[in-house]
Amino acid sequence: MSNSFLKSFKTRRTVYELSNQLSQEQGQLEELIFSAIELTPSAFNSQTSRAVILFGDAHLYLWQKIVRKTLRSLVTGDFSPTENKLKAFAQAYGTVLFFEDMQVVDRFKKDYPTYAPNFISFSEQSSGMAQLAVWTALATESIGASLQHYNPLIDDEVKAHWKLPAYWKLLSQLVFGSIKSFPGEKEIRSRIARFHTLSEA
């Protein structure tokens, strides 16, 4: 069975070797990314996901200043492997910062007390779907990306530097750009160990 949705999923891979040469305009990328998040479902239609796109100097500042300084103070051994990784991220075109609005999450906890213990989980599920939606949308435009998680180490400085709300919780950083080298075939584990199909009660 041929399915365009699954085909787009198959194009979405973790790509580390990226460059800053893209044919798309920044406005086109903004529309693509923000639309993907807007169309992502969320529990109770809470729409808790927030995003900030870093282009140009803002993208460089994140990786060359904020993340580098933070990790430099934590890594006690050889810093060169980390340095090389950060340089690779900086060479990409941009970064999407994914946040969740905890003020909205808290409001839904109060409005729906029966489900209050679940809203943190609901929020994280919504964010995960938004991240996948953006990642896949970029892949369909032949734009590579890798998902990073330097939170919570960089949260405070990111929010302070760009004057973002304190109640936004940073969950991930999606680095994207043109693909210099595509990864090899993805290893997929056996379905026998992962899935079941049932038809009898």
Features from the language model and the residues they span:
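Active-site-adjacent structural patch at catalytic or cofactor/ligand-binding sites
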Residues: 92-103
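A general secondary-structure junction signal
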Residues: 53-55, 100, 178
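Short, flexible, mixed-charge acidic loops at enzyme active sites
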Residues: 66-67, 108-113
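Short, hinge-like loop/turn segments at secondary-structure boundaries
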Residues: 69-70, 163-166
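Small-aliphatic-rich amphipathic alpha-helix that forms the alpha element of a beta-alpha
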Residues: 37, 102, 112-160
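Short acidic/glycine-rich loop or secondary-structure boundary segments that cap or lie
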Residues: 61-63, 104-108
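N-terminal amphipathic, basic helical "cap/leader" segment at the start of enzyme domains
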Residues: 1-94, 199-201
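C-terminal helix-cap and adjacent tail motif
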Residues: 4-17, 170-201
